[in-house]
């Protein structure tokens, strides 16, 4: 989820 960065953490974590 938050592996990529903070932006994914906000979006929900696509990865």
UniProtKB/Swiss-Prot annotation:
Q: Where found in the cell?
A: Secreted
For this record, an example GO cellular component is:
extracellular region
Q: How is the protein modified post-translationally, according to the record?
A: Conversion of fibrinogen to fibrin is triggered by thrombin, which cleaves fibrinopeptides A and B from alpha and beta chains, and thus exposes the N-terminal polymerization sites responsible for the formation of the soft clot. The soft clot is converted into the hard clot by factor XIIIA which catalyzes the epsilon-(gamma-glutamyl)lysine cross-linking between gamma chains (stronger) and between alpha chains (weaker) of different monomers. Forms F13A-mediated cross-links between a glutamine and the epsilon-amino group of a lysine residue, forming fibronectin-fibrinogen heteropolymers.
Kindly report the protein's main subcellular placement as a broad class: secreted
Q: At the top level of its lineage, which domain of life is listed?
A: Eukaryota
Q: Which keywords, in A-to-Z order, does the entry hold?
A: Adaptive immunity, Blood coagulation, Coiled coil, Disulfide bond, Hemostasis, Immunity, Innate immunity, Secreted
**Any single biological process term in GO:** innate immune response
Task: Tell me, in a sentence or two, what this protein's role is.
Answer: Cleaved by the protease thrombin to yield monomers which, together with fibrinogen beta (FGB) and fibrinogen gamma (FGG), polymerize to form an insoluble fibrin matrix. Fibrin has a major function in hemostasis as one of the primary components of blood clots. In addition, functions during the early stages of wound repair to stabilize the lesion and guide cell migration during re-epithelialization. Was originally thought to be essential for platelet aggregation, based on in vitro studies using anticoagulated blood.
Q: Domains: what does the record tell us? A: A long coiled coil structure formed by 3 polypeptide chains connects the central nodule to the C-terminal domains (distal nodules). The long C-terminal ends of the alpha chains fold back, contributing a fourth strand to the coiled coil structure.
Its recorded name reads Fibrinogen alpha chain
